[in-house]
Design a protein with these regions (language model features):
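Rossmann-fold NAD(P)-binding glycine/threonine-rich loop
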Residues: 120-153, 158-162, 167
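Redox-cofactor binding/interface segments in oxidoreductases and associated redox assembly factors
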Residues: 93-95, 117-118, 154
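Bacterial N-terminal signal peptides
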Residues: 11-23
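Bacterial N-terminal signal peptides that target proteins for export
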Residues: 2-13
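Active-site-lining helix/loop region of Rossmann-like oxidoreductase modules
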Residues: 174-235
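Short, conserved loop/helix-junction motifs that constitute active-site signature segments
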Residues: 107-113, 147, 170
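NAD(P)+-binding Rossmann beta1-loop-alpha1 motif at the extreme N-terminus of oxidoreductases
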Residues: 24-68
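Conserved N-terminal Rossmann-fold NAD(P) cofactor-binding segment
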Residues: 49-91, 95-103, 107-110
Length: 235
């Protein structure tokens, strides 16, 4: 993590986030977006507006829809094979479907020292359309187990891709809760969250992913579509 932070800092940009005061918070460098569906297609263009280099990882990088996303993203975004994208990046966003996440993640090569942003939810939808948490722990914990030398941060799993792509469409503030074991990695992801227009709250270590993923289950089972907004109680 110190290597990533030092590379960011050489760009001479420092961004402060009140919720995580005292941590090194920065913008810059390369983000690999693994997956070009709704989530990848929402976050990639948003992160590009912050000055990040965006590389989309796709099994078919020359496919028409992938190249259309590259063009939409602008800011010199590119697309290449997932393993190439991950190798070139400091931050890897796992924007695949949950059912594909393990195979996709393990195909990326050595992710030691990289930040892995996990927006996944381990959710099962039954025959009635009701959503259920589908694993004993959480997607976040499982991903951290699969890449033990990477720094996994759970974020962006509690809202829809439409709101990710256009935060102003929410009609008011939206809170993105994050969780992870490495404070510096969480600080970097927090800077992404606030940079694109959301509020951020650090909820704790990666085990808290269980709570965050169940928040999405409850959102999906509600009779209305809503976004989360909350603040820590003043101490």
């Amino acid at each position: 993590m110190k290597f990533i932070i030092s590379r960011f800092l050489t760009k001479g940009v420092l961004v402060l986030v009140g919720m995580l005061a005292g941590s090194p918070l920065v913008f810059g460098d390369t983000i690999a977006i693994i997956g070009t569906g709704n989530v990848g297609g929402a976050l990639g263009p948003q992160f590009a507006t912050l000055g990040h280099n965006i590389i989309y990882g796709s099994r078919e990088p020359d496919r028409e829809d992938v190249q259309a996303l590259v063009a939409q993203t602008g800011h010199n975004a590119t697309a290449m094979l997932p393993v190439q994208a991950a190798a070139a990046a400091d931050i890897v966003v796992m924007a695949t479907k949950w059912a594909q996440a393990e195979v996709a993640l393990k195909s990326l090569g050595d992710l030691a020292g990289k930040i892995v942003l996990d927006p996944n939810n381990a959710v099962h939808v039954d025959s009635s359309g009701k959503r259920h948490h589908a694993v004993a722990t959480s997607a976040g914990q499982m991903i951290q187990d699969w890449v033990p030398n990477a720094m996994v941060v759970k974020a962006f799993n509690t809202l829809g891709a439409g709101t990710m792509a256009n935060p102003e469409s929410a009609g008011g503030p939206v809170t993105i809760p994050i969780a992870g074991n490495d404070p510096d990695a969480k600080a970097v992801i927090a800077s992404l969250v606030t940079g694109i227009g959301f509020e951020v709250v650090d909820m704790g270590d990666i085990s808290v992913s269980q709570v965050l993923e169940k928040m999405l289950v409850e959102r999906g089972n509600a009779n209305i579509t809503f976004n989360y907004y909350f603040r820590p109680v003043p101490q």
